């Protein structure tokens, strides 16, 4: 395990350097990270290194117990750091494409997709959570949301970036210019993740110059600085989008139930059959409540984040970015909802 851990540590280091080489490399990473937005930054980087096309990853136990899905034979796990295990330990994720349904029925994997019917509700929720959004189209609203979210939260991360610019291209700059670069790149990176995850064409909204600043983050510490901030803030916004879509879907289901019940009642009344009450009782659809939602505390996450993921003579520390979210996409939320249902 020690040898494997060192290999993954080196992979993490090399991948971090690679994604900061140029704007295209950074955009490639962001395109992958937005699909597994509930993962920590260090996990997103290792997922990108091993399975850049991964859509929704989870541990084998989660696939088996929560989704009744089984990992395909000979599938190779995605190694990531395990902060909850002993020092210098790894855990393994498998993508949904590595799994298949069990014999006794599987739970749907909740991977949301943006649709035109969700857009208005999404924009209203983002405006409510992150400040007024003046735009009337989704892409512009996402850009505004990214800017607002970064403005509100980046200072928590910047205070730590200032202490780790040694040997980077940021080292000779004063605090003001470092902050300008950091804020600009973070806002563009968060916006890219939101737009990409919502299925819009990023080429229509970004060019190379929007990410030219990434080359200044050319040390492990500064790569962590921009990566962690981008990952945390984008996750916060994408969670809001996900919940908004769920709310619309549940409202549509409730509306369909109501319509079906009214139609059945009218049909029964017309037939004037005395057994209709028993029939309706048997066929009544029980309405379900919504999923509860807990917004991440961005300040706490910034203070206890993967700044502990440092490079030293021995490699990466066993400590990793603090988070209670081990599952990306919408898998983690489905797990918690299932647990509440069993309680």
Language-model segments: which ranges?
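N-terminal accessory/interface modules of nucleic-acid-binding and processing proteins
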Residues: 1-287, 291-298, 307, 336-343
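Long, low-complexity intrinsically disordered regions
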Residues: 290-335
């Amino acid at each position: 395990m020690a040898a494997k851990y060192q290999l993954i540590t080196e992979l993490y280091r090399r991948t971090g350097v690679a994604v900061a080489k140029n704007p295209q490399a950074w955009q490639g990473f962001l395109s992958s990270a937005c699909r597994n937005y509930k993962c920590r930054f260090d996990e997103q980087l290792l997922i990108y290194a091993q399975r850049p096309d991964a859509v929704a990853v989870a541990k084998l136990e989660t696939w088996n117990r929560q989704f009744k899905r089984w990992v395909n034979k000979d599938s190779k796990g995605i190694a990531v750091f395990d902060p909850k295990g002993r020092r210098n330990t790894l855990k393994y994720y498998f993508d949904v494409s590595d799994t298949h349904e069990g014999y006794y029925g599987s739970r749907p994997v909740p991977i949301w997709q943006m649709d035109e019917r969700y857009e208005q509700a999404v924009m209203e929720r983002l405006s409510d959570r992150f400040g007024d959004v003046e735009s009337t189209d989704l892409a512009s609203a996402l850009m505004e949301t990214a800017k607002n979210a970064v403005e509100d939260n980046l200072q928590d991360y910047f205070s730590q970036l200032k202490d780790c610019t040694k040997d980077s291209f940021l080292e000779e700059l004063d605090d003001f210019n470092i902050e300008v670069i950091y804020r600009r790149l973070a806002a563009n990176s968060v916006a890219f993740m939101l737009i990409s995850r919502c299925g819009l064409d990023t080429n229509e909204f970004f060019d190379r110059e929007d990410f030219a600043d990434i080359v200044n983050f050319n040390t492990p510490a500064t790569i962590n600085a921009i990566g962690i901030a981008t990952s945390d803030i984008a996750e916060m916004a994408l969670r809001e989008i996900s919940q908004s879509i769920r709310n619309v879907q549940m409202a549509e289901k409730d509306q369909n139930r109501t319509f079906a019940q009214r139609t059945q009642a009218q049909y029964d009344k017309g037939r004037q059959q005395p057994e209709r009450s028993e029939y309706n009782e048997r066929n009544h659809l029980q309405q379900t409540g919504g999923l509860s939602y807990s917004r991440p505390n961005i300040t706490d996450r910034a203070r206890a984040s993967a700044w502990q993921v440092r490079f030293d003579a021995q490699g990466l520390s066993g400590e990793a970015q603090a988070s209670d979210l081990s599952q990306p996409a919408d898998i983690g939320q489905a797990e918690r909802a299932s647990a509440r249902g069993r309680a």
